[in-house]
Amino acid sequence: MSDASRISPLDQARILSEALPHMQQYDEETIVIKYGGHAMGAEDVARQFARDIVLLEQTAINPVVVHGGGPQIATMLQRLGIKSEFAAGLRITDAATIEIVEMVLAGSINKQLVGYINEAGGKAVGLCGKDGNMVTASKATRTIADPDSNIEKVVDLGFVGEPEKVDLTLLNQLIGHELIPVLAPLATSKGGQTFNVNADTFAGAVAGALKAKRLLLLTDVPGVLDKSKKLIPDLSIGDARKLIADGTISGGMIPKVETCIYALEQGVGGVVIIDGKTPHAVLLELFTDQGTGTLIHK
């Protein structure tokens, strides 16, 4: 039995009526959606996400999808006998690894997602940050504390980059023309070196350059949690910084929230961290009164 068949016709009509003002709010606005590798899950989940993206485009919203692929990269590296190493939450990417990363991100994952969107009736265009020099990056570095001496040291992450500049020339040719950009988080240096970029960071940079109405970060957690592990539905930038300082926001959530803050400071209207495994998470956030996840705003 389908989800729709379990809802009465009257309730279906009420749901559509509730969605109308939200559709009007986002009319012809750009929404950047980061679709994480963990959130992709099974094929049926990915296809459902693709249908929801097509629905956004059909309601006069301009969706831009940025996808991750950490689990898929890890699987491919394991198959090839290449060991994965991480520092400060980022994959250390040597010369052998960057070739695999590019193959998985810009090849299999990107084209699969493009195919799902097109099968659902959309017109997706698969790209990465290297295309049209869309995203220029510089080498990223991180400092970590030695567990024995507690002395901080700089870690060489290899071919991992931080976005420096986003050129919107190519994206502006697609957005608003019934085309859905699907972006793999790869960038190039001024000298032509390929860099692997964290998908959250990449999405934040693109959303900031576009001055997007919303940036949605689909992850594998419900949102930002308090110390009792309860969802915090709403945070200002100031609140978020306080929660980082007191340790409530910790671990892998820190860079996600920092990306949210950066995007807001660049002109994004609001950023929401949501659980990508929740069915129709994007529609629940954009088209219902209660929304979902954690909204971070100025």
From Swiss-Prot:
Residues the UniProt record annotates as site (Transition state stabilizer): K34, K256
Gene3D superfamilies found in the cross-reference section: Acetylglutamate kinase-like
EC number(s) from the headed UniProt entry: 2.7.2.8
GO cellular component, one term: cytoplasm
One Pfam entry name: AA_kinase
Pathway: Amino-acid biosynthesis; L-arginine biosynthesis; N(2)-acetyl-L-ornithine from L-glutamate: step 2/4
Keyword annotations: Amino-acid biosynthesis, Arginine biosynthesis, ATP-binding, Cytoplasm, Kinase, Nucleotide-binding, Transferase
Function field: Catalyzes the ATP-dependent phosphorylation of N-acetyl-L-glutamate.
A GO BP entry: L-arginine biosynthetic process
Name of protein: Acetylglutamate kinase
Cell compartments where the protein resides: Cytoplasm
Lineage: Bacteria, Pseudomonadati, Pseudomonadota, Alphaproteobacteria, Hyphomicrobiales
GO molecular function annotations of the record: acetylglutamate kinase activity; ATP binding
Record field: catalytic activity: N-acetyl-L-glutamate + ATP = N-acetyl-L-glutamyl 5-phosphate + ADP
Record-stated family: Belongs to the acetylglutamate kinase family. ArgB subfamily.
InterPro entries named among the record's database cross-references: AceGlu_kinase-like_sf (IPR036393), AcgluKinase_fam (IPR004662), ArgB (IPR037528), Asp/Glu/Uridylate_kinase (IPR001048), NAGK-C (IPR041727)
Keyword Cytoplasm: yes
Disulfide bond annotation, renumbered to this chain: none
SUPFAM superfamilies on file: Carbamate kinase-like
Stored NCBIfam families: argB
Record: residues binding substrate: G69, G70, R91, N196
